[in-house]
Amino acid sequence: MAERTKFSMQWHITDRCDQRCKHCYIYEGKDKKCGLELDLDTLKAILEDFLRTCDKLERDPFLVITGGDPLLYERIWDFLEILKEKKVHFGLLGNPFHLDYDVVKRLENLGCINFQMSLDGLRETHDYIRKPGSFDATLDALKYFEGSKIKTAIMTTVSKTNIAEIPELVDIVVEHKVSNFGFARYCPNPEDFDLLVSPEEYR
């Protein structure tokens, strides 16, 4: 029987996060505080609806779970156990601060396919955008995936702040044997449109 085409959904389950990135739309208010997340019963209801949709479309479900940092979701392991029971594979978009060998192994056993973190420039630039120590923590966390079936991914949100550092950043990502490296377009707030990269600069 031929494998069905995947139906992928990116799912924001929590606002909880260790970082306060300059470009984050969740924490862009003056108080920089936001703790919204979905309770487990709501997640289960949405999941069932998603699975019914996949069945109707004759597609295999795949979830890209994000936040915030999904590892900070209070019942993340209960939720991932449900996904395993339903035979739903998933990827995570998160931070490096709650990863270790045991966490990665647990994620692998529950059906995690990939784990994406961010590098928004070289050390000084990245730490300015995200938080001090984040650059080294991200590179250090990649070691936990060595020998794992989980593929690693690095995403860079490109702005005028970091565009000149992209070539050197590519070398660093290759050196650390990251499986996938991608770019996201910077979405400016009203006060920082000057950081937006022009189409000509992207070329």
Language model features with spans:
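Conserved alpha-helical substructure of the radical SAM core
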Residues: 1-113
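Radical SAM enzyme [4Fe-4S]-AdoMet core and its adjacent flexible, acidic
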Residues: 12, 33, 109, 118-120, ...
